Amino acid sequence: GQEVSNALNSYHVAEQQQAHREQEVQLLTDALEKTQFLFQHTNNTSYLSVLTAQQSLLSAQLSLINDKYAKVQAAINLYQALGGASF
């Protein structure tokens, strides 16, 4: 019924959020690599830019871990809504 529908919707939302976060992590990884390259090979980039890029990447990676947890929790909730055993 409604509980299964809600649990399934929550799972799909968590799945989409994780996919978007994975893209964000990839983009920030690329940005960090480019920033490090510019820092090492030019005089146009400060070390602060490298640190900022690292901080952004680490923050996104932490958010990705939280998104993965939310997806697992949503899967458990869906399993339980379908009549599975409680954990």
Over which residues does each language-model region extend?
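Amphipathic alpha-helical coiled-coil segments
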Residues: G1-S63, A70-A81
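Terminal intrinsically disordered/low-complexity segments used for targeting and assembly
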Residues: L82-F87
